[in-house]
Amino acid sequence: MLTNNELMEQFYFPDEAPAIPEFLSNDTFQQLEQLMYQQEFSTSDSQSDGANSCSLEMYYDTPSVLELEHMLNAQEQQQHHLQANPLGKNQGRSPRYWNKQQRSKPYDKLSTSMSSSTSSASSSSSSSAGFGGEVLKKRRLAANARERRRMNSLNDAFDKLRDVVPSLGHDRRLSKYETLQMAQAYIGDLVTLLSRDY
């Protein structure tokens, strides 16, 4: 399982460019890239609006948008790499990638704080794993015993109710639902009987 730091490193600094999905063609990537450019121009035009510019900037700086831009950059790099040198590895990064890297710094700070808290929690949990396992086992056994007692007392109460409620035939045992329905009808009949004037 990857920690947050490893995930961020894998996301922002992959060992090699990710493979292009088979269902996406070059035209699709070009359309996505044009859409990204249009969004960048629309955000730069709307930055004069004051409050709207802040919300748009935060919207376009989300990790999903950055991931899409990274995928587009990786696809471009793969195309240039395959055209220029089909056997070597791609070592460079486009300038747009580094611009997006600087825009994503708030997420880096968030991920480092989250990863430090998860690493401290994992270290404390690994030290108390032996002791915690026994405690959890005892708690689980106690909870199972309580649930068994509760179900037994509930079944006993239904058995007593079946003995009191008149049923149509004694050839089969009434289900819990049928027992409750019969008890409701029986109580209703008793109430009407008691409310009569003699």
UniProtKB/Swiss-Prot annotation:
It comes from the Eukaryota. Pfam families: HLH. Residues 76-131 are annotated as: Disordered. InterPro entries: bHLH_dom, bHLH_transcription_factors, HLH_DNA-bd_sf. Residues 138-190 form the bHLH domain. GO terms for molecular function: DNA-binding transcription factor activity, RNA polymerase II-specific; E-box binding; protein heterodimerization activity. Transcription factor involved in early neurogenesis; sensillum basiconica formation and maybe sensillum trichodea development. Promotes multiple dendritic (MD) neuron formation. Required for olfactory sensilla; regulated by lozenge (lz). This is Basic helix-loop-helix transcription factor amos. It comes from Drosophila melanogaster (Fruit fly). The gene is amos.
